[in-house]
Structures are given as C-alpha cells and as structure tokens.
A protein has these predicted regions:
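Oxyanion-hole/transition-state-stabilizing segment in secreted/luminal serine hydrolases
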Residues: 117-133, 142-184, 189, 200, ...
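Extracytoplasmic/secreted proteins, especially bacterial periplasmic and envelope-associated proteins
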Residues: 111, 140, 144, 148, ...
Length: 291
C-alpha cells in the first residue's frame, strides 16, 4: 500500500514539473498546477492495485435489480476446481423470472437445488395441497446455493424447504468433505434465520457418466457426511434419494433417468415424489397454504 502511494506521488510530481516546464506564462503555470492538484485528489481516491477484499460481489445488478452470477472465486464456502460454463447465463435468466413473480411465492415450500430440481415441471401438480416454489438453477453448486440463499429462499419466508444439491460439485471434481461442509453451512444459515424452519435434505442421486465408479464412491461419502449432520437437528430430515435409484454398484436405474443418466425423466420424478410424501407428512409441511 505504501509503495503504491509513493508511486502515485511520483507520477503527480512529474506531471507538475512537466506542466511548469511547458508553460509560457505565469497564468499557464498556475492553471497547470491547479489541474495537477485536481488530478492528484482524483487519483488518491482510487484504490491501489494491491488492495484485496474477501467480501462477495453484490448479488444484484444496479441497473436492473436482477441477480447475476458473481464469479466462482467470489462465492462463499469451498468451490470445486471448475463449473459448467453456462451457469452465469442460466443464473441471470432464472433470477429475472423470479424477481417478477417473487410476491407470489411468499410463504411457499421452496424446492431448492440445481437442474434436477429446476426440471420438475409437474411440481405444483404433484403437490396440490402445498404452495410450492421452484428455486432450482441448472448447473448450480453448493456454494452457489449458499450465496443466493437469502434472496432466493429466506426472503420468501418459506413454510419449509426441500434441498437437493451437490451433484455438480462432485461432477466438477469437488471434494466430498468440502461439499458436505458447504451443505452444513446452508443448513446452519437456515437455522439461524428461523430455528423452527423445517428442511428436508435429499441425498445426492446416482449418476452414470464418465468415471461412474469414482462418482459413486464420492457421492456415497458426501451423503453419509450430510446425513450424520442432519440427524443431529430435530427440524431437519433426510429423504433417501440415493437408494431409490441406485443399484449395488451405484449405477442409476435407466428407467428413471434421461439418456444422460443424470437428469430424471417423468418416471423418475414420480419416484422422488413417492419418497418425499411420507417425509413431508412427518415434517407437517401441510400447514402451508394450498395454491
């Protein structure tokens, strides 16, 4: 910081000397000195390049009020080495849509997650006795959810939350322990907002693409770590969305998945609903107003 200011002062001094040498009259010298002093004030108000901050960028665009993806390094928690390059565009698109209809989702049971949650097109029909809101973003990761939790979920004062997140962390070579820690931070933030708010945490589902065996082992580790934490909290519950889809090797049942062996088809969503129904009943989400 000191070196930066010294360099700045040197630049200003040199500018003044140059102005004095080039002036042909006292009036021009005086004008040049005045200009130099103004420039000095403006330059010293600017931050030096060595300054850094750990605070995340604003979640909204000042001009439109629509939230934009802040960049991987500006997310809280521990992020994977890389992410899907289309996430920023999907993030902006979804937030623009949600901003326009946010008032309609106040008091809803919020389904929070990534593209698997986002793709539940029959969500409202499948839970006719609940007011539900979908806050899934395709390609999202745990630290992305942690970043947008307040604006997308807690600001709605939800009646409950159904969380499914983590497969994109694993798919982008994230460490299961880091992903589990991010998930714990999400849940702790929810508890801090409202200690009585009930949350269903869905286990990360199996996937069968490249490195299937490696992914299966990592997802099992992640699910076990998250479940251990959830069991310590009376207002949190687990929905086992791993074993309802996976065989003994952790390979997803092709009947329930699209051809990418990652995203659910209509049959797969029906299986998820069946698994959720008794957990929702136990958590008494039915207190949410019917739509």
């Amino acid at each position: 910081m000191v070196a930066c200011k010294i360099a700045l002062a040197t630049r200003i001094r040199n500018g003044i000397i140059f102005a004095m040498k080039s002036a042909s009259s006292f009036r021009r010298v005086r004008s040049s000195l005045l200009l130099a002093s103004v420039l000095a004030a403006a330059l010293t108000a600017l931050p030096c390049g060595a300054q850094t901050t750990n605070a995340p960028e604003s979640s909204t665009n000042d001009a439109t009020g629509v939230a934009h993806f802040p960049g991987l390094d500006n997310l809280p928690g521990k992020h994977p080495p890389h992410i899907w390059n289309g996430l920023a565009g999907v993030w902006a698109r979804d937030h623009a849509r949600w901003k326009n209809g946010a008032s309609n989702d106040v008091g809803a049971v919020v389904f929070l997650g990534d593209s698997i949650t986002e793709g539940w097109s029959s969500l409202k029909r499948d839970f006719p006795n609940l007011k539900v809101a979908d806050r899934g973003i395709g390609g999202d990761i745990t630290c992305g959810v942690l970043y947008r939790l307040q604006e997308d979920v807690l600001d709605l004062d939800p009646a409950g939350i159904v969380l499914l997140i983590g497969t994109n962390d694993i798919g982008n070579d994230g460490d299961p322990a880091d992903v589990a820690d991010n998930t714990r931070q999400i849940l702790m933030a929810i508890k801090k907002f409202n200690p009585n708010l009930k949350v269903i945490v869905c286990k990360v589902m199996p996937r069968s693409d490249r490195n299937q065996a490696v992914y299966a082992a990592r997802i099992k580790q992640l699910n076990a770590l998250v479940e251990d934490y959830v069991k310590t909290e009376p207002n949190f519950a687990i929905c086992d969305t791993w074993s309802i889809y996976a065989d003994d090797q952790g390979v997803p049942n092709p009947v329930d998945f699209k051809t990418d062996h990652l995203h659910l088809n209509a049959a797969g969503y029906a299986v998820w609903k069946t698994a959720l129904d008794p957990v929702i009943a136990k958590m008494n989400f039915a207190t949410a107003k019917s739509q």
